[in-house]
Each structure stands twice: as C-alpha cells, then as structure tokens.
Amino acid sequence: MIMKEKIQLTKLAPNCGCAAKVGPGTLAGVLGGLPKFCDPDLLVGTDTSDDAAVYRVSDDLALIQTLDFFTPVADDPYDFGQIAAANALSDVYAMGGTPKTALNIVAFPKDMDVEILGEILRGGADKVMEAGAVLAGGHTIQDDTPKYGLSVTGFVDPRKFWKNFGAQTGDKLILTKALGAGIMNTAIKADLVTEGARKAVLASMKKLNRDACEVFKEFEVHACTDVTGFGLGGHATEMAVASDRTVVIDTEKLPVLPDVEEFASMGLIPGGAYRNREFAEKTGVKSVAELWREDLVFDPQTSGGLLAAVPERDVPEIMKRLDAAGLQAGVIGEVVDRREWTLEIR
C-alpha cells in the first residue's frame, strides 16, 4: 500500500494538472462530429469553446454548469484538493457568475492509503466553502492514477454574463495571475525548484478567481475567459477567432512567477505547450518575442487567472482595484482589427 507519509503525488502521473488535457486541436476535431443541440434557453453551449454552459431558467436567472478534474499537480494531497477545486470553480467566475453547488469527481488507486483521499477531499471542501458554495455529494471510481475535480453549478443574470467572444478593436487585455505554472510544475517534478518558488506557484494555483471577478463586475467586460490548460496563447486564440479580431500580446508586460525564465531557458517546457502552439498556428501566429517568452505564452496553466477584454478608458481604475485586492495582474496586450494572423506575440 502507498502510505500517506511517503507520497509524492506528482510522481504518479506523466502529466500534471491541466497539462494533462487533450490538445485543443484534437478536441476540436472530436467535438466537430457530435450532434448540435438547439434550445433557445441554451445561451452558451459547445459552439464557441467557452468556459462553461449557460442555461436560462427565467428572465432573471441562468445556470452556469461546468466540470473540471485532473491528475495531481502538487505532492501534498490537501494542496492538490485545493488547487483542483479552485480550478473547477474558476469557470463560473470566468462567466461572471457565482458558484452555488459542487459535486466531487474522484478516481483513486485501490492500493493507496485512504487517508490520502481524505486529505484531497478536505482540501476541495475547504476551497468550496471559501467560495461560498456548498459541496453536495460526488462520485468515485478506482483507477491507477489519482484524479480529482468538481462539477460546479453557479448562478448568473442571463442578461449580464460574460462570454469568451465579443472583444472589440481597441480593447485592452488584462490578465489577473502570473504565468508559468506549467513550466514550474515541470521543474518541481525534476526537483529543481527552491522552496520559495514552490510556495509561490502553489499559492497562485490555490487562489480563487473570485476577487478578480468581483472587480470586473463593476466595469464593462466585452469578453472574458480563464487561462488554463490551453495556455494564454490558446485561450487568446479562441477569443480572437470567436470575436473575428486579432489579439496582440506584449510579452514584456506579462506577470511571471519566480524563476520561470531560468527553467524555460533550460528547456523545461511541458508537452502541452507545443500542442497549444500547434493549435494557435492553424489560424495564424506572428511572433517576434524571445523564445522563452514565446514558450511562456503557450505554457499550460493550472488554475490560472482571468483574461478580460475591456475598454481602454476603464483600465486605470480596474488595475487600481486589482492591485488593492492583492492580485498580480497586468495589462498584457490589446485587441486589433483582424489581420492575416489571429495571434501576435511581441
């Protein structure tokens, strides 16, 4: 039996966290063959690769439905539970909603100490409670590799929710968390990371996107998504394509986790970054950035920040409030008229 005292959860999975996602290009090909569902109250479905589904219940209420689960992204079971829960809850915040209920999704090896599962679930429960939602049950299966996540339902006004499209020419792009989680988790698996840098990436992944969501609710948001497994480049590409615009990213303005440049320059890039790049290149990428910064743009994030397209006039006040909330946010780019490419990296 694998005991709690000796566990290193990240050693049990070839890909950690959102880096284990099926690539966006492969996924798009599979989903393209599925039947389309037509319902006037289904306000957001699969058509735009958005963060969650939105279903109108009444003129004043819509349900946000999402689920997310993945392999361990932290060695400590409690940390893993918190990160997985924060990541799953994030999709509701990315739509401008409020999480209300959650259900556990668990895969767990039969030869592993059940106390490890208890700690994973405790971490998830504490994060759901922090979000002000309620944990109402779940489902478990046996599997060789532990996996954990949540199915989450949230509420939103059907007239006010955010979509990952609608970005307008002249909008500025604001990112609310530092990048580099995928690169850092690769370095952590190789035992190359200092304790300070390890704590920084864990704190970032455990941070709810609630505060960022509450700030953005006070302003006009033309488009919003959260940056997770498809990386900043992949999610920005989805926003650009769906909005029929080009997104320009200024890599000098990107908020970055400690020591990311060192490890990226060493080539510690997760495989998901290359799949994300291939996806973006299908609709066109123009880059003049340093290689490590370009890799950072496509680095798959776990429980990453919100990426919002907002009017330029609101940027100073938004940044002031995000800073007051203790968020490591940055104005990282802009939206321009559609060019021959959809993503430009400077």
Where do the protein language model's features map onto the residues?
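Helix-biased detector of long, well-ordered alpha-helical tracts
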Residues: 2-346
